[in-house]
Amino acid sequence: KMNMLLDFPTVGEPHYAQALPASMIRDKQIRTYSLSENKDPYAVRSEKETRVERKGNVVHIYMTSIRSHFVPDNIEGIQVGDSVYVHLTNLEQDWDVPHGFAVLGFTNSELLVMPGQTRSVLWIPRRVGVFPFYCTDFCSALHQEMQGYVRVSPRGSAVPISFNTPK
């Protein structure tokens, strides 16, 4: 019969590294960020504050990122030619957990959003389709789960704005 001598992650294996209350390391960290210090006018401070708003041909997506998901993560009702502003707030508070953001078909580069920060980007979809968005900066063992989709409908479509948020 074999005895387990040690249950410990190997180098580069982060599965066990995320079960620690921030209060245990706060005094040892070089930098932490309080969400209350984020003064960006487009910031949201919780997943429940996320939303998608249409004003004519302009759509504002107020989104959050945290290991290992975006909220909202599935968005419908965007139309070809809309000016879509994605306002992404990184809800992480420890300095070393940035999140990236890119959409297939972006005409500009990705965003890199540091903990506690909000960054915005403009996207104008040029064709109908389903466009994946994803995190471009490795953040945790479930990094590949950080993705979602935007469905773009034809101009004048009756598809209403809809999106997923936590219950």
Placement of each model-derived feature along the sequence:
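Extracellular/periplasmic metallocenter environments
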Residues: 2-8, 12-25, 33-35, 40-55, ...
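Long, charged N-terminal interaction/targeting segments
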Residues: 27-32, 60-63
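Short acidic/polar alpha-helix capping motifs at helix-coil junctions
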Residues: 32-38, 72, 84-85, 99-102
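N-terminal edge beta-strand
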Residues: 51-83
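Hydrophobic residues in beta-strands and at strand termini
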Residues: 63-65, 78, 88, 103, ...
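Solvent-exposed coil/turn segments that connect beta secondary-structure elements
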Residues: 66-68, 83, 89-93, 106, ...
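Beta-strand-rich interaction surfaces with strong enrichment in secreted/lumenal proteins
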Residues: 73-76, 108-112, 122
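Histidine- and aromatic-enriched segments that form or immediately flank copper-ligand environments
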Residues: 87-118, 141-148
